[in-house]
């Protein structure tokens, strides 16, 4: 019997709003981010799911999103595991910089490569491949066994840590994942087969609103 895996990207953060590279820095949600998280929770409540466990990162924007989703589905006290393996991609020396200022310092082409290549990290930071190298093993050892045991599992995390998971779940190429944008607060509901491949996927919201 296979279970259900729900992935949710955190709501808009204060640094998303200011156009800053965030990474492992820890800004809170904006008012819009709170509304996005609540809307994602409301969509899951309407869907009718009840979770067995939740996973999130050690960063407050993901943790608050996770809690708001659980509040919305009536499971405020559900066991939640926080682990830095699910943290956002580490942007290294870019962390805290305005994206326009970074382009002025390093050049638009170089910053674009750091942001959108699969395996070229910014100085002192991680590439998307590096991010996946910590996210995927954690998924395989801690999350997937619960789903395969029939549990309903919530993962509230970040744009790039979730892209690393979606890349494998949806069987995307390196080129395809670079063009993948995940909207804040929009749940993705995966039903998995016994062999851990995807049986079905539903998006509960407008993924075209990604930023």
Swiss-Prot record:
Does the entry feature the keyword Isomerase, yes or no? yes
- Recorded metabolic or biological pathway in which this protein acts: Carbohydrate degradation; glycolysis; pyruvate from D-glyceraldehyde 3-phosphate: step 3/5
Task: Please name the gene that encodes this protein.
Answer: gpmA
Its family remark reads: Belongs to the phosphoglycerate mutase family. BPG-dependent PGAM subfamily.
- Give the Enzyme Commission number: 5.4.2.11
Q: What is this protein called?
A: 2,3-bisphosphoglycerate-dependent phosphoglycerate mutase
List the keywords (alphabetical): Gluconeogenesis, Glycolysis, Isomerase
**What is the species of this protein?**
Sinorhizobium fredii (strain NBRC 101917 / NGR234)
Any one Gene Ontology MF annotation carried by this entry is: phosphoglycerate mutase activity
GO annotation, biological process: gluconeogenesis; glycolytic process
Q: What does this protein do?
A: Catalyzes the interconversion of 2-phosphoglycerate and 3-phosphoglycerate.
Annotated PROSITE patterns: PG_MUTASE
- Active site, per annotation: 10, 88
What phylogenetic lineage does the species belong to?
Bacteria, Pseudomonadati, Pseudomonadota, Alphaproteobacteria, Hyphomicrobiales
A Pfam family assignment: His_Phos_1
Binding-site positions, substrate: 9-16, 22-23, 61, 88-91, 99, 115-116, 159-160
Q: Which domain of life is it from?
A: Bacteria
* Listed transmembrane segments: none
UniProt-listed HAMAP family: PGAM_GpmA (MF_01039)
């Amino acid at each position: 019997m296979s279970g259900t895996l729900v992935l949710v990207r955190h709501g808009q953060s204060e640094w998303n709003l200011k156009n800053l590279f965030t990474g492992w820095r820890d800004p809170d949600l904006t008012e819009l981010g709170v509304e996005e998280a609540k809307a994602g929770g409301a969509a899951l409540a309407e869907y009718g799911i009840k979770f067995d466990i939740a996973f999130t990162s050690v960063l407050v924007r993901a943790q608050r999103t996770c809690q708001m989703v659980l509040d919305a589905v009536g499971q405020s006290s559900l066991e939640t595991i926080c682990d830095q393996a699910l943290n956002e991609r580490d942007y290294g020396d870019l962390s805290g910089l305005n994206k326009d200022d970074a382009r002025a310092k390093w050049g638009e082409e170089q910053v674009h490569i750091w942001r959108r290549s699969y395996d070229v990290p910014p100085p002192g930071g991680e590439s998307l491949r590096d991010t996946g190298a910590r996210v995927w093993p954690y998924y395989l050892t801690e999350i997937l066994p619960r789903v395969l045991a029939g549990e309903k599992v919530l993962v509230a995390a970040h744009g790039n840590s979730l892209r690393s998971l979606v890349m494998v779940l949806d069987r995307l190429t390196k080129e395809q994942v670079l063009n993948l944008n995940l909207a804040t607060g929009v749940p993705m509901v995966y039903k998995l087969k016994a062999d851990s491949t995807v049986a079905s996927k539903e998006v509960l919201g407008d993924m075209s609103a990604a930023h």
